[in-house]
């Protein structure tokens, strides 16, 4: 890895450590998955030897990565290998990710439609910006059409590939209403498909995360949904059903995108699993030594009973009462 790449990665991590941490977390989640051969794409070429992916070496090196704040503060020569790996994780010629303020979530809710049920506010919010030519190509495809904003839920291990390769309709396993990428205007529905998963052990975001994508979708006939005809209250049936659909028409609040060029991920909503609060040290000690405590109390009770039944105790007690 060239020194300039390390310097660029250090600068990127210094500028937005949480965004850099997110990319490390998504990478680590894909690496730990039993489907890692398919979800860890792209894969670092330096760990591909003789056309074989050395997952064990990559797992070992990833496990040795300190958290990014520690890595930024360190200047040890032994950290060069760590920076080589982080540099690869953060490198992209297509996009960049940066942290967004939580107030941006209100804007997202407006873009997707006000929720009918209370939805949890994400712990972290990130925005993706695309470089040319990918960005200009998307807007060329859009032309004069409107943009639809909708949520896509998926397992954490899939997001490394989703970010770098996009959402591909032919890879989607949910096909009740036809082949395509399924999205929804209801965040609570998307969260069902985004269970918490193990990310990076040293993540500043937390070791267990859930992620939901907010997608920009070009309003095109290849995007199937319950939508009204222009200047009419009647549903456009040509867009409400996909050929060979087993479930009939697309339900309300859902979108099925049948063309990969019509959508891209714009935001990432990240939820960190709350760790149970630590009990006080006293409670912790009591819970750890409950058997010893109970036995001690039992022995103390036996001692009290024994003493109270003794003649010496009765003699002393009678003298006290006089």
UniProtKB/Swiss-Prot annotation:
UniProt subcellular location: Endoplasmic reticulum membrane
TM regions (residue ranges): 288-308
Any one GO molecular function term: NAD+-protein mono-ADP-ribosyltransferase activity
Function comment: Intracellular mono-ADP-ribosyltransferase that plays a role in different processes, such as protein translation and unfolded protein response (UPR), through the mono-ADP-ribosylation of proteins involved in those processes. Acts as an inhibitor of protein translation by catalyzing mono-ADP-ribosylation of ribosomal subunits, such as RPL14 and RPS6, thereby inhibiting polysome assembly and mRNA loading. Mono-ADP-ribosylation of ribosomal subunits is promoted by NMNAT2.
Binding site for NAD(+): 152, 182, 254
Organism field: Mus musculus
GO CC annotation: endoplasmic reticulum membrane; endoplasmic reticulum tubular network; nuclear envelope
Protein name: Protein mono-ADP-ribosyltransferase PARP16
Domain spans labelled PARP alpha-helical: 5-91
Membrane topology (Cytoplasmic): 1-287
Pfam families xrefs: ARTD15_N, PARP
């Amino acid at each position: 890895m060239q020194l300039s790449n390390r310097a660029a990665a250090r600068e990127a991590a210094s500028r937005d450590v949480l965004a850099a941490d997110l990319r490390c977390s998504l990478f680590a989640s894909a690496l730990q998955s039993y489907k890692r051969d398919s979800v860890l794409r792209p894969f670092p070429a330096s760990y591909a030897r003789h056309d074989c992916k050395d997952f064990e070496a990559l797992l070992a090196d990833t496990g040795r990565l300190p958290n990014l704040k520690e890595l930024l503060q360190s200047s040890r020569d032994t950290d060069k290998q760590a920076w080589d790996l982080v540099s690869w994780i953060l490198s992209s010629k297509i996009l960049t990710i940066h942290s967004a303020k939580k107030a941006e979530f209100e804007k997202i809710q407006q873009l997707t439609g006000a929720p009918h049920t209370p939805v949890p506010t994400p712990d972290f919010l990130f925005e993706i910006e695309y470089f040319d030519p990918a960005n200009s190509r998307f807007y060329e495809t859009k032309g004069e059409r409107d943009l639809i904003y909708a949520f896509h839920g998926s397992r954490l291990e899939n997001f490394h590939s989703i970010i770098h390769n996009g959402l591909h309709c032919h890879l989607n396993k949910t096909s009740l209403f036809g082949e395509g990428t399924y999205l929804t205007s209801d965040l609570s529905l998307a969260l069902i498909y985004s269970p918490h998963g193990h990310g990076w052990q040293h993540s500043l975001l937390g070791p267990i995360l859930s992620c939901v994508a907010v997608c920009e979708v070009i309003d095109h006939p290849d995007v199937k949904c319950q939508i009204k005809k222009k200047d009419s209250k009647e549903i456009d049936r040509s867009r409400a059903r996909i050929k060979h659909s087993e479930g009939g028409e697309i339900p309300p609040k859902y979108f099925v995108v049948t063309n990969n060029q019509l959508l891209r991920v714009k935001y990432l909503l990240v939820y960190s699993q709350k760790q149970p609060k630590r009990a006080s040290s006293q409670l912790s000690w009591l819970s750890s030594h409950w058997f010893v405590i109970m036995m001690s109390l039992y022995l103390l009770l036996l001692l009290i009973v024994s003493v109270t039944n003794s003649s010496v105790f009765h003699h002393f007690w009678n003298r006290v009462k006089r």
